[in-house]
Every structure is written in structure tokens, then in C-alpha cells.
């Protein structure tokens, strides 16, 4: 079953085409990786799916329903959660509170930043037990009272994943989940992604770590200049002459 369908997306910024007729589909229960050089349109695609930017043409459907024109918080409520390259953690807030705030964050970033006195007014309503379970899942149960800024970069990546999971979404959009981290943490995150897939989650990720992509992906999609240039199982896509010419050489 197709969980996500992207149809002929076009988006230009100051005359530069970031998306140029990009189409793809994500099957339910798959781990799909999107690769491509810088400027290929990968993060622009994620922003379009999540409603952070309006496209010039084309459409996005999730579970058969159009996402066009919906605000990001409405798209999140339909069952799409995401991470960002720049992590977007609250560095001066505890690990536990970051995850608890994650329940709010995916409902619209403007909501998160506009809440005044959240800690005193709404902490009693936060699902602390669920947040602790998510931190245990990612291996940060011993860090719940630490400030986010005191975590290593790899641990911050794990915390970002826990925050993403707070919405219990069906589709996870992960922007470079293992970029810039040590091999041990990379393997931990890849293991977590496989566990999430086994539990019924669908994962669509952007990643430059080709070895990680080959290890974890069911399908790899290669983008170049805003278009899809290849798609298929990793072992086949990585040998595609067009891919080798455009990206891997």
C-alpha cells in the first residue's frame, strides 16, 4: 500500500529550480533513503511534504488524502513526524523536557515557541511515562535530567529521534539521522530504525552516509537537480551508470 505519494512537484527559489517535476511513492512499512548531492532538492522535498513551504505545482498525498494547503501542525496530526539537520533541540532544557515538549513541537513550531510558562502550567499534563519510555528506547535513560547541550552530538541525534517519536506518527521523515556521528552510535541508530520498521513504522530518510544507506534501506531514491534519476534496491541503484555519474563519483 502506498502511504505517501509525491506527484510532479515543482518549486523554484529566485528562479533556481529546487524541485523539477519530482515524483515518488513510499510503500507502507518500508525504509526508503533519498540520496543526492547538495542542491538536489532533498530537504526542499521534506519541507514541501510537511507543509513548511508551498510548492509551485504538483501535489502530495498521505494515506490517499491531499496535503496541499494544510498547515504543518495539521499534517503532523495526520501522522507525519520529522527531524531536521540542525536538530532543533532546546539546549538549556533537560533531556526529559525536550521529549515532553516534543509532543507540542510536532504540532507546529510556532506553538512551541509561543507557549509562556509551559513548565509550570502544563507539566502536570505531560506524558512523562511515555517520554521516559522513549528515552529508554533510544538508550538515554541515564541522561534524563541532563541539559541537552551537555550531550555529545551522537546523543543529541538520539534525543532528536526520541522527540520525533513522541507523536507516534506512522511516517517518520529523518533528515541525515547518522550524519557526523561515530560508528557505534551510527549502528545504534540503524538498529533503532529496523526496530521501528518491525513495529509498523514507515521511514523516509535523507542521508549522505552511503554505507548506512546500503545497510538499512529497502529502497534507495537518487535525486539530482530536483528530479528523480534512479530508484530501486541499494545493490542495484549503486551500480546505475546515471547514479555513478551524477553522485557517487
List PLM regions with ranges.
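Conserved ABC ATPase "signature" region
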Residues: 111-143, 191-194
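The feature captures the beta-strand-to-loop junction immediately N-terminal to the Walker
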Residues: 35-37
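Conserved ABC ATPase signature
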Residues: 147-151
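Conserved ABC transporter NBD signature motif
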Residues: 58-65, 78
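Catalytic Walker B motif of ABC-type/P-loop ATPase nucleotide-binding domains
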Residues: 172-176
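A short, surface-exposed alpha-helical micro-motif characterized by mixed small hydrophobic
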Residues: 213-215
Amino acid at each position: 500500500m502506498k502511504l505517501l505519494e509525491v506527484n510532479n512537484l515543482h518549486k523554484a527559489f529566485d528562479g533556481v529550480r529546487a524541485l523539477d517535476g519530482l515524483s515518488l511513492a513510499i510503500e507502507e512499512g518500508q525504509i526508503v533513503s533519498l540520496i543526492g548531492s547538495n542542491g538536489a532538492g532533498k530537504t526542499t522535498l521534506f519541507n514541501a511534504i510537511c507543509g513548511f513551504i508551498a510548492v509551485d505545482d504538483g501535489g502530495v498525498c498521505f494515506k490517499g488524502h491531499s496535503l496541499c494547503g494544510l498547515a504543518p501542525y495539521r499534517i503532523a496530526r495526520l501522522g507525519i513526524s520529522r527531524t531536521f539537520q540542525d536538530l532543533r533541540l532546546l539546549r538549556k532544557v533537560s533531556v526529559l523536557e525536550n521529549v515532553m515538549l516534543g509532543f507540542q513541537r510536532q504540532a507546529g513550531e510556532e506553538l512551541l515557541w509561543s507557549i509562556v510558562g509551559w513548565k509550570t502550567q502544563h507539566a502536570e499534563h505531560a506524558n512523562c511515562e511515555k517520554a521516559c519510555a522513549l528515552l529508554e528506547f533510544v538508550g538515554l535513560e541515564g541522561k534524563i535530567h541532563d541539559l541537552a547541550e551537555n550531550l555529545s552530538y551522537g546523543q543529541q541525534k538520539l534525543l532528536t529521534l526520541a522527540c520525533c517519536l513522541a507523536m507516534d506518527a506512522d511516517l517518520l521523515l529523518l533528515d541525515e539521522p547518522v550524519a557526523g556521528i561515530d560508528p557505534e552510535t551510527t549502528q545504534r541508530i540503524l538498529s533503532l530504525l529496523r526496530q521501528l520498521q518491525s513495529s509498523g513504522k514507515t521511514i523516509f530518510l535523507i542521508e549522505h552516509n552511503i554505507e548506512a544507506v546500503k545497510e538499512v534501506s529497502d529502497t534507495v531514491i537518487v535525486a539530482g537537480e530536483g528530479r528523480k534519476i534512479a530508484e530501486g534496491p541499494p545493490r542495484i541503484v549503486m551500480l546505475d551508470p546515471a547514479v555513478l555519474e551524477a553522485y557517487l563519483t
